[in-house]
Curated annotation (Swiss-Prot):
Localization, UniProt: Cell membrane
Family per record: Belongs to the KdpF family.
Function statement: Part of the high-affinity ATP-driven potassium transport (or Kdp) system, which catalyzes the hydrolysis of ATP coupled with the electrogenic transport of potassium into the cytoplasm. This subunit may be involved in stabilization of the complex. The Kdp system is essential for growth under K(+) limitation, and for survival under desiccation and salt crystal inclusion.
Organism whose genome encodes this protein: Halobacterium salinarum (strain ATCC 29341 / DSM 671 / R1)
Quaternary context: The system is composed of three essential subunits: KdpA, KdpB and KdpC. The complex also contains KdpF, a small non-essential subunit.
Keywords, alphabetical: Cell membrane, Ion transport, Membrane, Plasmid, Potassium, Potassium transport, Transmembrane, Transmembrane helix, Transport
GO MF entry, a single one: P-type potassium transmembrane transporter activity
Protein's recorded name: Potassium-transporting ATPase KdpF subunit
Cellular component GO terms, alphabetical: plasma membrane
Length: 29
């Protein structure tokens, strides 16, 4: 359970960071 929660947390942070990057640099897309 702990490992699964850790992986979920890492994935969530990665997705949020990616979305923030896309919103900050929309001209690249």
């Amino acid at each position: 359970m702990l490992i699964g929660e850790a992986v979920l947390a890492v994935v969530t942070v990665a997705v949020v960071a990616y979305l923030t990057y896309v919103m900050m640099y929309p001209t690249r897309f």
